[in-house]
């Protein structure tokens, strides 16, 4: 699920598109590079988001994202 795009289904950010940057059990962390940055991602329950079928990052882009967090927000914005 990490690297996929997701749409928020509940909360004040309902309808917003995010990139899944981390997951842990029933909780995922989302970033959009604008209001939710890579350094301070949004924590959301899995049932409150829906994955987008097309889009996201492949494994090489994700590795680069995690190794170089200084440019992470720009890369996330481009992906969305």
Positions of the model-derived regions?
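Ferredoxin-like alpha/beta domains used as RNA- or RNAP-binding modules
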Residues: 1-2, 9, 19-80
